[in-house]
């Protein structure tokens, strides 16, 4: 999510409510906010995934690189070891003109992880799309603006009778709200919320499934 610091950690009790409904996540993204500020939450979240046997193929962790502690490194490693595939797993640095320069010592710490990708989040926004929200509304028209609202695709697997949700970046906020995309700012949450972790996923996506079948 975009916007100013919110000074709040992920509420694990909110996440736990929805995990029994999930059997597999193809690509799990841990972002924020800033995940390096709460390695204990990362560890406890992993314990919940283990408790409910939620399979994860890949994990993608995005950090600003300002505070790389041994606890954060260990939490990243634990998540990497938990994943089944790891073909796309990575820890990436937010490196662009809008972020402060990252200390080289912190970069070296991250390089100790084999799945560290030091170029994946290096973006020249003069050549790439920006989101027309928040401070980006004030950028000049030389920058390309990207539409970001995406309609998810959902279907029922006939053999397993399970709900499959694809073609979207389904996101859970720190407060337990479920969004169809995480590329928004905090102030936009109410406008893009499709439910919360108290809801049943099948009920949230019933209309989409009915439209397809």
Where does each model-flagged region fall?
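Accessory C-terminal segments flanking Radical SAM cores
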Residues: 138-213
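Radical SAM/AdoMet-radical enzyme domain recognition
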Residues: 12-32, 38-134
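Canonical Radical SAM [4Fe-4S] cluster-binding loop centered on the CxxxCxxC motif
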Residues: 1-13, 182
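General structural signal for secondary-structure boundaries
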Residues: 7-12, 69-71, 83-85, 105, ...
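Arginine residue identity/basic-tract feature
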Residues: 2, 53, 126-127, 135, ...
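Short, flexible coil/linker segments at or flanking structured domains
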Residues: 3, 18, 158-160
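Short, contiguous strand/loop micro-motifs
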Residues: 5, 32-33
């Amino acid at each position: 999510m975009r916007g100013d610091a919110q000074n709040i950690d992920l509420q694990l009790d909110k996440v736990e409510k929805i995990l029994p409904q999930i059997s597999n996540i193809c690509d799990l993204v841990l972002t924020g906010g800033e995940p390096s500020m709460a390695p204990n939450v990362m560890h406890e979240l992993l314990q919940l995934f283990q408790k409910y046997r939620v399979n994860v193929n890949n994990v993608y962790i995005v950090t600003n690189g300002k505070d790389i502690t041994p606890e954060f490194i260990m939490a990243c490693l634990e998540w990497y070891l938990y994943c089944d595939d790891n073909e796309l797993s990575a820890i990436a640095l937010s490196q662009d003109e809008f972020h402060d320069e990252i200390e080289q010592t912190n970069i070296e710490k991250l390089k100790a992880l084999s799945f560290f990708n030091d170029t994946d989040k290096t973006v020249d926004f003069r050549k790439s799309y920006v989101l027309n929200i928040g401070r980006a509304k004030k950028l000049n028209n030389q920058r390309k603006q990207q539409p970001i609202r995406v309609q998810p695709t959902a279907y029922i697997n006939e053999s397993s009778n399970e709900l499959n949700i694809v073609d979207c970046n389904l996101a859970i906020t720190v407060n337990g709200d479920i969004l169809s995309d995480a590329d928004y700012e905090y102030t936009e949450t109410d406008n893009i919320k499709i439910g919360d972790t108290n809801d049943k996923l099948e009920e949230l996506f019933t209309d989409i499934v009915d439209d397809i079948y």
